[in-house]
Amino acid sequence: MTVATILATRNLGLDIGGATIVADVDLEVRDGEFLGIIGPNGAGKTTLFNLFSGLYEPTSGRIELAGEDITGEPPFRRSQRGLGRTFQVSSVFPLLPVVENVRLAAEARIGGTLRVWRRAAGFRAALDRAVWALERVGLAARAGWVAGALSHGDKRKLEIAMVLASDPRVILLDEPMAGVSVEDIPELVEVIKSVQVQDGKTVLMVEHHIEVVTGVAERIAVMHHGKLLAVDTTENVMQNEQVQAAYLGEPL
């Protein structure tokens, strides 16, 4: 059975100030898969996520979500279509309670007016969604904490809960292990993997920890100088001589 493509780029490119940042990227992401994206610093990985989420406008090509061209749409519209994202730098509201961070994310996804969300039923629906998301990532016991008091690993879990509360079809995780202690990484990896397997989400993850990527990704895309060098199964990518030379400089 052929698996449908949920996210795709066609000849996607971005030039800034005369420099080519992303060039001719053709990528098809399968519905429900876990795709890892690796590459050296400056390869264009985060820029690709910025193009996906609408923070940057490409100079060429297009982006499709579930078969529809979303290239010219603003970030909020892409979110409403089911594209969720976390960032390298923590994006939580540190002075708000953990549960309120997630509830606000749930409200933003549904896109109702303030009038709608002042109604008790609307508030309750968003709160219920927030409580569910916190349970999914193991933060229910810290729902009343001020978000700024969380450990870095728990802040990453909170960001994932905020994305889950928005009920996305596709989740973009930009270096979720950045700043997380070695001891906390395995638990965070399990949370991320469960989101894909149990909740049926499509996950794209940019990550510098190769062992994390190879442990969870079904396929890996390798970027180098703004181009896709390879897209293949984890095993094949790790044995690819071009990847070894361009990314690691030596065999894996």
Can you say where each PLM-predicted feature lies in the sequence?
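Glycine-rich phosphate-binding loops of nucleotide-dependent enzymes
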Residues: 2-252
